[in-house]
């Protein structure tokens, strides 16, 4: 991407397309004020104070036609999100009016922004680093308040600060090692340098490994738990799904095989987003459509983070029940004995001891499912510690793992008695890898790819 294109004036609709109370068309760049003024009838936007909202009308400069009655926000560089002049035109919501204003601005000299380009400019102008830019999208995509809390902390710079501090410490260590090698003042300088490198490398490794330990929790809160609801036909899987969702999404009848495919929905369980997959009942069937659903159910079971196995407590165990118990035994599984409001006939002695008796009809013990999920995945600890920094982004996790591997190579080399100057290479590589997280050492291709995943207008 050319420098000219990076820093021309861009525009986009920043609110979702469709009907709504308010629509926002955003401008950013050197000519933002002049372009906005060319279609605005009201105060002179190039003379108003920064961070003010100004009433007026958007007009077509060629015909003089009024397009809409608007409020225009003016924010002057550098105290803006992009650190450029920014104008936001607040219109009445609607596809026609926002698109008409957008086309006017483009005709007056603005360029249509690419996905994520406003945030990309904030990054290029030093307003945010790469982790903070990614946090913007995480906030937009957050499915629960806990996921949003983690993203907001990242946007606030908690992860950036930790990474930058570690990189600085690594740089200080490399400088000290270099001085000791090039300007030895003591006879035992080699032993001193080796001891320093061992101490600091172990310190860095411990810090990054502690950060990695937050990844499981952070990733779950960011992306959710893929949860398969399995069981033979007509044991109450769809009723359980509807109960958790608190709305009727799945067909509930007394006819076996009414769920003929996989139904997916998200539900918030105490701050954890569960991607609930209601599977077709797993059984032998001659119905071709249902057979396809059964095969998809087996695949969903294999890929799930969590399995909710539903059994009918009012009937004796069947061969299908036993097959599902065996099939799911290596999974993170919660066994639910449904229909406990009826006479119990199931053989409890043939089941593991950790089952939960429930009644979807009466809501009995549904809350215990949430408690068991907390026990399985969070060791009964709180989901988010207020002052903790969490890894939740797969890119960050992968790079931290690579950084730890580089530090392990340094420690292994020290144990083998390798020369310190050779081990500097791996420590330098650790410093570079951590720089990829914040964007200080990230290739242009990666930056372009990351911002292309953003929505238009952000």
From Swiss-Prot:
One of its GO terms (biological process) is tRNA wobble uridine modification. GO terms for molecular function: GTP binding; GTPase activity; metal ion binding. SUPFAM superfamilies: P-loop containing nucleoside triphosphate hydrolases, TrmE connector domain. This is tRNA modification GTPase MnmE. The keyword Nucleotide-binding applies. Exhibits a very high intrinsic GTPase hydrolysis rate. Involved in the addition of a carboxymethylaminomethyl (cmnm) group at the wobble position (U34) of certain tRNAs, forming tRNA-cmnm(5)s(2)U34. Binds 1 potassium ion per subunit. It comes from Streptococcus pyogenes serotype M2 (strain MGAS10270). GTP binds at residues 234-239, 253-259, 278-281.
């Amino acid at each position: 991407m050319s420098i000219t294109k990076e820093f021309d004036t861009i525009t986009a609709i920043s609110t979702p397309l469709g009907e709504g109370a308010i629509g926002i068309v955003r401008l950013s760049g050197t000519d933002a004020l002049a372009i906005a003024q060319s279609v605005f009838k009201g105060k002179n936007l190039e003379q108003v104070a920064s961070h003010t909202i100004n009433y007026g009308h958007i007009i077509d400069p060629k015909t003089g036609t009024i397009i809409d009655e608007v409020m225009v926000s003016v924010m002057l560089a550098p105290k803006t999100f992009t650190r450029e002049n920014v104008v936001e035109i607040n219109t009445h919501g609607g596809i026609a009016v926002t698109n008409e204003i957008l086309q006017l601005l483009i005709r007056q000299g603005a360029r249509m922004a690419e996905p994520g380009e406003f945030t990309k400019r904030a990054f290029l102008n030093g307003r945010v680093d790469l982790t903070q830019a990614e946090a913007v999208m995480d906030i937009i995509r957050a499915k629960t308040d806990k996921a949003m809390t983690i993203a907001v902390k990242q946007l606030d710079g908690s992860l950036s600060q930790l990474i930058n501090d570690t990189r600085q410490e690594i740089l200080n260590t490399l400088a000290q090692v270099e001085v000791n090698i090039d300007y030895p003042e003591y006879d035992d300088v080699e032993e001193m340098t080796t001891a320093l490198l061992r101490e600091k490398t172990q310190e860095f490794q411990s810090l990054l490994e502690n950060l990695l330990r937050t990844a499981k929790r952070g990733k779950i809160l960011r992306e959710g738990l893929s949860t398969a609801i399995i069981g033979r036909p007509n044991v109450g899987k769809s009723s359980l799904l509807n109960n958790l969702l608190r709305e009727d999404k799945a067909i509930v009848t007394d006819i076996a095989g009414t769920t003929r495919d996989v139904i997916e929905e998200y539900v918030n369980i105490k701050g954890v987003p569960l991607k609930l997959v209601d599977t077709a009942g797993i059984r032998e069937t001659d119905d071709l459509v249902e057979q396809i659903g059964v095969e998809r159910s087996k695949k969903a079971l294999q890929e799930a983070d969590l399995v909710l196995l539903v059994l009918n407590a009012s009937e004796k165990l069947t061969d299908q029940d036993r097959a599902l118990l065996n099939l799911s035994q290596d999974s993170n599984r919660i066994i639910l004995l449904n229909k406990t409001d009826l006479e119990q006939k199931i053989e409890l002695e043939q089941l593991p001891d950790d089952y939960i008796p429930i009644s979807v009809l009466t809501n009995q013990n549904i809350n215990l499912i949430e408690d068991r999920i907390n026990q399985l995945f969070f060791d009964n600890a709180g989901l988010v510690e207020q002052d903790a920094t969490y890894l939740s982004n797969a890119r960050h996790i992968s790079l931290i793992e690579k950084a730890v591997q580089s530090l392990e190579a340094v420690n292994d080399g020290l144990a083998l008695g390798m020369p310190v100057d050779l081990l500097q290479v791996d420590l330098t590589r650790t410093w570079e890898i951590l720089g990829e997280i914040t964007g200080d050492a990230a290739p242009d291709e990666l930056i372009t790819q990351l911002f292309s995943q953003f929505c238009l207008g952000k």
